[in-house]
Amino acid sequence: MRTILTAAAAAALSFGAFCAALAQEDAAGGADALEAEAVTGSAADYFGRDKFTVETIVCPFKGKLKYKPGEISCGLLTVPENREKSRSRAIKLHFVKLHARKPEKWDADQRGEWKKREDPIIYLTGGPGAQAVGYVKRFKDHGARDVRDMYILEQRGIGLSDDFCPNYALFDPAVANVGAFEAYQRAALAAMENCFAGAKARGVDLAGYNTIENARDVEALRRALGFEQWNVWGISYGSILGQAYLKQDPAGIRAVVLDAIVPIVPGAHFQRVGAHFQRDLDLLEKACLENDVCKRATPDFQKRLKAAMSKVAKAPIEVAAIDTELFPSGKAWFFPDIIGGAPFISLYEQDNYPTLPAFIAALAGRVERGDYDAFRALT
């Protein structure tokens, strides 16, 4: 069962994590061939071709998110694709600024006159590979902006940051529309391999897409914006990037908060994810059993979740698809990764914890009854 939990949790993580791992593996294979182009000297030399300038752009999500002029702004930062190589091409990275704004309820008697702090927050996004727009939605009304500007840098290779697999999810939907989990996994892997092959054919240097370069990009943005120091906040993969950034730019960091910390050792998060998921389920179950209402309503939700995952592993969920453009066969299949992945993703937000036992019990109940009609909403 630990294997199934690991697979479910890993599948719930973003495509970018796999993309980055495969890209770095590909890059490692050609390391000898790159030595002639390698930058040598001190660490400062790695920024020898950075211009530390930004250009203002209209935010790509304008018209899709509601905000007033002056609340959110966007820009591009030009950086070398691979700072390890002297002849690397330049790429542009997208960043978003969420401007500090005085809260409607500001207690001047207790907190003094409102004034914006000059030490902003840089939020390190997750994945790797999560686009900035999701974080803009999440933080545009967040209390962290009460006195500080917040910056979000879209990691290289995704979104508006020179996406090297644009429209990745739109190609050939029939390939992954299969009824066997193993075939689905093979199709997903083949799509990633095709993405990398196409990127390389267009001259993309995959060796430049890694956590070290991401950390250097964060320093480059800080210097381009003219801040001596800022406050660093990273969650999930952002905690890996945060650890790398601590080593990269210690003098540029005023304070750092890393949440849901993942080891910086390559691959360690996937090796441990099943154990961590199991620990979270155990803690959730313990809390439920200590609450009379929860104990009466959902006393065995963890056992039922695992049984549901086992059932779906043997017999995948099959439903009639609503959108036949996305599911050309007219059918859609779901596997145990979605049964375990739904509560796994829900664990990211503490606000979900009180309802999680009931949610898991309801999800397991659907599987127990073979009542899969609700899954059509995902098609």
Regions found by a protein language model. Give the residues of each.
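Boundary at the C-terminal end of the N-terminal hydrophobic targeting segment
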Residues: 19-25
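Long, low-complexity intrinsically disordered segments that are proline/alanine-rich
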Residues: 25-32
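P-loop NTPase catalytic cores that bind/hydrolyze ATP
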Residues: 331-364
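Small-residue-rich helix-loop
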Residues: 368-379
